[in-house]
A protein has these predicted regions:
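Short, structured coil/loop segments at alpha-helix boundaries
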Residues: 43, 66, 90, 134, ...
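Flexible, active-site-adjacent loop/turn segments at secondary-structure boundaries
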Residues: 47, 207, 236-239
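Generic alpha-helical secondary structure signal
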Residues: 54, 78-81, 127, 131, ...
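Phosphate-binding site of ATP-dependent enzymes
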Residues: 120-225
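Intrinsic-disorder/low-complexity loop/linker signature
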Residues: 62, 113-114, 121, 214, ...
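Extended, compositionally biased non-globular segments
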Residues: 229-245
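Conserved N-proximal alpha/beta basic substrate-recognition cap immediately N-terminal to
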Residues: 1-92, 97-120
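Short, glycine/acidic-rich beta->alpha junctions
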Residues: 52, 85-87, 166-169, 245
Length: 245
């Protein structure tokens, strides 16, 4: 049956990985360096160079896959007025740099009272948010690049499954697919330290998930270099929460 064929395919894949990576054991931790070696070896270089959130959004929409609505794409100073109109007309949204990594430049706007916006960086005004967009376009988070592109998009609400065990923000699930097969999965849970961002570098907790059924297999807070059994803020048990299909 189908299950037998999938098991056989996975068994063959694991045997191939053993041959390719003979120096490492399969139960070793997949470090960033090892992961990056796999990325470099098995992916065309131009894919990493074009890791654009906007481009990814258009590709997903073309495949009829849901993605947060884009309110504004700001590529130049001439686009700032459009960004301001979006900011002033909405109470909830997210500002991101198009191709930043590690959560750099993100502002999450959860609501507003009058002219004051409740954000992941504390109270802000429309002027302050637009100023942040301008800094993104001017290249503040662009590394060696001279300029950048900002994206203002809809804010995603957390699933009730994760809202109960996370400190605000929106947890996500990441799955590494190797040669067409899902091999490793994890969820990233925001904390107070990460300011509601599901970003491990900022303080979020990473919880490994069994690919077969989503069962938690261990939780680690990278920013504190420690394994944890419970969420540091909510106290939720991170060894037994359910992840539905």
């Amino acid at each position: 049956g189908m299950a037998t064929r999938v098991q056989l395919a996975l068994r063959n894949l694991l045997a191939w990985v053993r041959q390719e990576e003979g120096r490492a054991k399969l139960d070793d931790v997949l470090t960033m360096n090892v992961r990056n070696k796999y990325i470099t070896r098995y992916n065309p270089g131009h894919l990493r160079q074009s890791a654009s959130k906007v481009e990814t959004k258009w590709r997903l929409l073309g495949l009829d896959i849901s993605t947060p609505a884009a309110y504004a794409i700001v590529e130049s100073m001439e686009d700032l007025q459009a960004a301001r109109r979006v900011v002033e007309s909405r109470e909830s949204f997210v500002v991101k740099r198009d191709d930043a990594y590690g959560g750099e430049g993100i502002i999450v706007v959860r609501g507003r009272t009058g002219e004051t916006y409740e954000t992941s960086r504390g109270p802000m005004t429309a002027d302050g948010i637009v100023k942040h967009v301008r800094k993104i376009v001017q290249g503040q988070y662009a590394g060696l690049a001279l300029d950048g592109k900002a994206l203002v998009e809809a804010r995603v609400e957390a699933s009730p499954v994760f809202a109960a065990i996370s400190a605000g923000g929106v947890p996500d699930i990441r799955i590494i697919v190797f040669r067409g097969y899902p091999v490793i999965a994890m969820t990233r849970l925001p904390t107070v330290a990460s300011n509601g961002q599901a970003n491990l570098h900022q303080g979020a907790v990473g919880v490994g998930l069994a690919v077969a059924d989503g069962t938690p297999v261990g939780a680690y807070q990278q920013s504190q270099h420690r394994w944890v059994d419970r969420h540091p803020d909510t106290g939720a048990d991170l060894s037994a929460f359910p992840v539905p299909n």
